[in-house]
A protein has these predicted regions:
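Catalytic cores of RNA-modifying enzymes
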Residues: 1-149
Length: 149
């Protein structure tokens, strides 16, 4: 997913809902400047210990202040915050360049159909339930968001 997202070394990337760091590890290996956002205090502490070179925010992802410079998001956020998160990321003034978000497949399809003036939204890779531990009750897809030029 990180390779498909086109993450480049030195690029600022948010991992929202970082959990135990599965995506974070790939982002670090890609050379990204990672900001991991995690609501669970134990997981946030574990992320700090496991990845000392990144910034970890113990915070509600829907309440964080987005970076004031261009950034990407590569994340598997909690499904319950998908709509609020997309509203924030796509809001006027956001410096979002691109996002690759693992979402509930129905939500990804809904947003891909919607019109967005400043961004293109498409459904990318489909992920079956068995791709996750523990498996969710729904299938997932990557929502690919790119800023229009």
């Amino acid at each position: 997913m990180v390779a498909a997202a086109g993450v480049r070394p030195g690029e600022l990337v948010l991992d929202i809902g970082a959990g135990e760091g599965a995506l974070t590890a790939h982002l670090v290996r890609a050379g990204a400047r990672v900001v991991a956002v995690e609501l669970n205090p134990r997981r946030a502490c574990m992320l700090r210990e496991r990845f000392p070179g990144i910034t970890v925010l113990h915070a509600d992802a829907t309440a964080i202040r987005l970076p004031g410079r261009p950034f990407r998001v590569v994340a598997n956020p909690p499904y319950g915050i998908s709509s609020a998160l997309l509203h924030t990321l796509l809001a006027p003034g956001s410096r979002l360049v691109a996002a690759d978000l693992v979402l509930q497949r129905a939500v990804a399809r809904k947003y891909a159909v919607g019109a967005a003036r400043r961004f293109s939204l498409t459904v990318g890779l489909s992920l079956p339930r068995r791709a996750f531990l523990p498996p969710p009750h729904v299938d997932s897809s990557v929502l690919v968001v790119r800023r229009r030029r």
